[in-house]
A protein has these predicted regions:
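Pre-Walker A (Motif I) flank of P-loop NTPase domains
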Residues: 4-13, 105
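Glycine-rich phosphate-binding P-loop
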Residues: 11-24
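Short beta-strand-centered segment that lines the nucleotide-binding/catalytic pocket of NTP-utilizing
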Residues: 33-44
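ATP-dependent small-molecule kinase phosphotransfer cores
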Residues: 44-106
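Small-molecule kinase domains that catalyze NTP-dependent phosphoryl transfer to phosphate-bearing small molecules
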Residues: 61-73, 147-192
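NTP-dependent small-molecule kinase module
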Residues: 95-99, 168-224
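RNA pseudouridine synthases
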Residues: 101, 107, 113-121
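Conserved phosphate-donor/acceptor-positioning beta-strand/loop module used by diverse small-molecule
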Residues: 120-142, 148-157
Length: 225
């Protein structure tokens, strides 16, 4: 089947919704590269900072406040003044890495405000994946090998961080339908059904239809959603 040319898909997701799995399947469907935590590695290479710094600040606003209140106070202060190191700078390095990756060909991004960073790029489709709370809790319990209460806490804490991060940098509201081109509840259709629906939406909304150059998807280390 013909596929949209130069497609860029940005996938936002609730924790435990299966969004990362759907993103991988979309990358396979359209022959695109998949960028999840790989963006942190690219940002680290471009900036010269350690990838660990980007990991600790990943979709988490307030990283420096935590450092300054703990044992990392001296480290944080020294790096801030000596390297003009701040959360906003980290976000910009990451945004630059996203823009560079998007310029190199068709790809799928998971989270990290990619939909906002690429808002002026032609062919970008933004999708948000949600799911029923019970299913999300079950998925997190299985992945983390924890009880229901712990899984619920992981979801609530993780989503609070994601929402704060997204809202701050984009000026939009995380998870609000108005912030995306398409919102899908994976509990209604299942992972494969949700993937098929999104793929069909992308094909129908694309102004051109042409086979994408096939690129192997990159393995992801994140299994959080």
């Amino acid at each position: 089947m013909d596929k949209p040319n130069n497609i860029i898909i940005c996938v936002g997701r609730q924790l435990g919704s299966g969004g990362q799995i759907i993103a991988r399947k979309l990358a396979e469907e359209f022959g695109c590269k998949l960028y999840d935590r790989e963006i942190l590695n690219l940002a680290a290479k471009e900036s010269g900072f350690s990838e660990k710094i980007f990991e600790q600040n990943d979709e988490h606003k307030g990283f420096f406040r935590a450092l300054l209140s703990g044992h990392g106070r001296s480290f944080a202060i020294n790096n801030f003044y000596q390297n003009e190191f701040s959360e906003e700078n980290l976000f910009q390095f990451q945004a630059d890495a996203i823009s560079k990756a998007a310029s190199e060909g068709p790809c799928v991004f998971v989270g990290r405000c990619a939909d906002y960073v690429l808002r002026d790029v032609e062919g970008v489709v933004s999708v948000f994946i949600t799911a029923d709370m019970g299913e999300r809790i079950s998925r997190v319990m299985e992945r983390k090998q924890c009880d229901e209460e712990t899984a619920r806490h992981i979801i609530e804490n993780g989503e609070s961080q994601r929402a704060t991060y997204y809202n701050y940098y984009t000026g939009k509201k995380w998870g609000n339908a108005a912030s995306y081109d398409l919102c899908v509840n994976s509990s209604r259709l299942g992972i494969d059904g949700a993937t098929a629906l999104i793929a069909e939406f992308i094909r129908k909304s694309s102004p051109t239809s042409q086979t994408c150059p096939t690129s192997p998807t990159r393995p992801t280390s994140s299994q959080q959603s």
